[in-house]
């Protein structure tokens, strides 16, 4: 970046990264250990998938509601509520032993986490200019990758000496610690936050005016939302079942299969920086950039299908899956993090952030049980082929949205 980043911007970036880290630690921990949970509870993947589906459905619906509410109340307060409720849900999961009760608790957990992303985007968009926003949103996104790397690398070792329930309790403790850090340090970093939640001082000029959204933008919006649903199917659908794929296809031990999943998480962390750079320096259009990345996902998914059919290599499979997930996280960065900021003039950044992010979890809610069922009935070859089909559809809808999105950028958001 050409602009010097101030200490305050760095502080905002890394504090919100911790918040997002806590969200992932307390949200995906059960999914990371689901292979071990299936083994301990002696249940099929499809039977326990309802727990993950409950979270994703609640998270998706909650995103919309939290986005609307997030434009009306202080983002800082909303983040406190979300972290506190998520910590309570993780503690409650320690004591739950029936699938029904676990589903209820994890569904409430989804609601808790839905209260975090819209206020994060609103705080960043109302406080930072475009260049600082790009710097910050990449760092915030790192929080998800760091949490994923930590869970996938540490859980296999911990599962050898303790129950998965104990690990979830540890995650709750981490969430409570970060909650206290947020309460203490956010006061200093967002000291000028007004009653409506706007941070004054370094606020971009275009946030202070409210303009109606042109009607033609709803066409590319619908296409973008479809693209987000498709990337959600790939992101969570692929990530959640990597350990099962490795365990069932290559006979890798459950704990080792979980550990191998850390490789895609490392690739994803690097991808945030790479795709942000490509977007700013090369494509300069987040929707077209997403189309290109969907094309990359299609190529890698096709290669994965060929490897699965002919070579049966665990190492190569992990590397290709890592590239698929890295691509999908790049799409997520473009469509979930960058696109909502283009609506700053409407004064509804949190609303659009919640709406778009909800689409991710519509896709995830569909993909998690569907991929599990396809794998059980038709095998992993057909499951991998479905990834390629989804990537192709994502490429098509993003390309379809590009012309009107360019017009929207030119006439509204960049004007």
PLM features: residue spans?
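Extracytoplasmic gate region of multi-pass secondary transporters
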Residues: 30-32, 219-272, 332
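Conserved MFS/SLC helix-loop-helix module at the cytosolic interface between two early adjacent transmembrane helices
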Residues: 61-99
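Cytoplasmic membrane-interface "Motif A"-like loop-to-helix N-cap segments
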Residues: 72-82, 280-295
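Helix-loop-helix hairpin linking two adjacent transmembrane segments in secondary transporters
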Residues: 140-190
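C-terminal transmembrane helical hairpin of 12-TM major facilitator-type secondary transporters
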Residues: 286-335
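A late C-terminal transmembrane helix in Major Facilitator Superfamily
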Residues: 343-378
């Amino acid at each position: 970046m050409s602009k010097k980043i101030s200490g305050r911007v760095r502080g905002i970036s890394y504090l919100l990264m911790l918040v997002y880290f806590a969200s992932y630690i307390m949200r995906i921990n059960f999914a990371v250990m689901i292979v071990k949970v299936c083994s301990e509870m002696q249940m099929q993947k499809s039977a326990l998938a309802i727990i993950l589906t409950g979270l994703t459905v609640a998270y998706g619906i909650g995103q919309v509601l939290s986005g609307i509410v997030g434009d009306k109340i202080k983002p800082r307060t909303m983040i406190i509520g979300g972290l506190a409720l998520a910590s309570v849900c993780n503690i409650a999961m320690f004591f739950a032993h029936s699938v029904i009760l676990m589903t209820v608790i994890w569904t409430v957990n989804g609601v808790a986490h839905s209260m975090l992303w819209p206020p994060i985007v609103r705080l960043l968009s109302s406080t930072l200019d475009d260049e600082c926003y790009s710097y910050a949103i990449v760092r915030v996104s790192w929080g998800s990758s760091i949490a994923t790397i930590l869970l996938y690398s540490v859980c296999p070792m911990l599962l050898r000496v303790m129950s998965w329930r104990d690990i979830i309790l540890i995650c709750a403790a981490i969430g409570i610690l970060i909650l206290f850090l947020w309460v203490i340090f956010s006061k200093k970093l967002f000291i000028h936050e007004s009653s409506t939640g706007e941070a004054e001082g370094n606020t971009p000029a275009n946030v202070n005016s409210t303009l109606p959204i042109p009607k033609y933008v709803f066409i590319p919006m619908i296409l973008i939302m479809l693209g987000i649903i498709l990337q959600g199917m790939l992101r969570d659908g692929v990530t959640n079942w990597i350990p099962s794929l490795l365990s069932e296809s290559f006979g890798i031990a459950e704990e080792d299969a979980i550990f191998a999943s850390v490789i895609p998480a490392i690739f994803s962390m690097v991808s945030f920086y790479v795709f942000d750079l490509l977007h700013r320096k090369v494509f300069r259009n987040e929707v077209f950039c997403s189309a290109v990345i969907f094309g990359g996902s299609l190529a890698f998914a096709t290669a994965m299908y060929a490897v699965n059919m002919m070579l049966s290599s665990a190492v190569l499979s992990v590397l290709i899956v890592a590239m698929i997930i890295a691509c999908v996280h790049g799409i997520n960065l473009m469509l979930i993090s960058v696109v909502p900021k283009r609506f700053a003039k409407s004064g509804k950044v949190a609303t659009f952030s919640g709406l778009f992010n909800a689409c991710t979890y519509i896709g995830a809610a569909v993909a998690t049980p569907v991929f599990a069922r396809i794998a059980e009935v038709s095998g992993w070859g057909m499951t991998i082929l479905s990834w390629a089909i989804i990537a192709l559809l994502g490429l098509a809808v993003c390309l379809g949205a590009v012309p009107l999105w360019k017009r929207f950028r030119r006439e509204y958001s960049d004007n």
